[in-house]
Amino acid sequence: MRDTAKLLRFDPDQSDPGIDIRQPVNGQRRIGAIMIDLGLLQVEQAEQVLDIQRGEGGRFGDLAVSLGFLRKEQVMVALARQRALPTLMPDDLARLDSDLRSAIEDSGSLRAYTDARTQLELRWFDDAPERRTLAVISDGPREGRTLTASAVGLLLAMTGRRVLLIDACAGSGRLASIFGVEKKSLSLTEAISSPDRALRLKSTLDSLDLAVLSAHEKEFNADTAASRGFASLLATVAGHWDAVIVDTPAWSVDRTAFAVSVRCSGALISVRLGHSRLDGLSAIRRHLADGGVERIGAVVQRF
């Protein structure tokens, strides 16, 4: 299993406190040396930061930002490089929909999504292709289902996994707009007709390996989800990506979410406090059990 990684955000306490940027500490290169190598900082600027650090203390990255030499996002990039972790580069972060940016920048939401990712790593995603597909479901609309699929997929990609997000919400799906995918890109039904075409999908982000396959207008339904063609597509992409996450229509709308869940064999439930119906959630649990679908867990959100 891969080591998990939290979303790297600028935190002065995470910056390397060392004085000599040339000497590694505990096997890690100094943050200042990495910044110079990346072209983010000039040697003269690094020396100025070190002079202040010697006299006043403080963290290297924090001081460099306070002096106007760096932006917080640049320190984040250097920290990720220091720890050999993938990170969401500033240009990619700016490309994301504002709702997703807000979700991953809010500590409460981020904690819920990170916990869900950890559960999936421990209980579901592994090297077996049949355990690489997951449906994200909710009882009704506006219960955070698409946001959950997007955020968990993003966090999984930040562990170094190759992630494919599939939008099975024909006519109402938002994954393409959340990640800035062009509408003329390969559609879900086209991929079902020719699964190998899905293997040529490119990452929507420059800094992480995350691709999106969306359903175009009115072209994917419960019958399509239950078809052998969709099962064949899932088997094909599960042999190529480490994690395949399928966003579904609301469970109460039609049978599509149930059919997708059965094909994926595992499901993650999105719950909105004060909005999701208890009887609806109970019905989902019963139907998942009857369909042989493993319920991996739930993400509880308040918004």
Protein language model features and the residues they cover:
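Non-catalytic accessory regions
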Residues: 1-96
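Extended, non-globular alpha-helical segments
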Residues: 94-128, 182-184, 189-192, 196-206, ...
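Phosphate-binding loop that captures ATP/GTP phosphates
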Residues: 155-216, 234
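Signal for well-folded cores of large energy- and translation-related assemblies
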Residues: 36, 54, 65, 80, ...
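Helical mechanochemical/support elements of P-loop NTPase systems and associated helical scaffolds
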Residues: 27-31, 45, 56, 60, ...
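C-terminal lobe/tail of nucleotide-utilizing enzymes
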Residues: 2-9, 87-116, 282-303
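Walker A/P-loop phosphate-binding motif and the immediately C-terminal alpha-helix
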Residues: 105-181
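Conserved catalytic-core segment of NTP-binding enzymes
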Residues: 189, 224-303
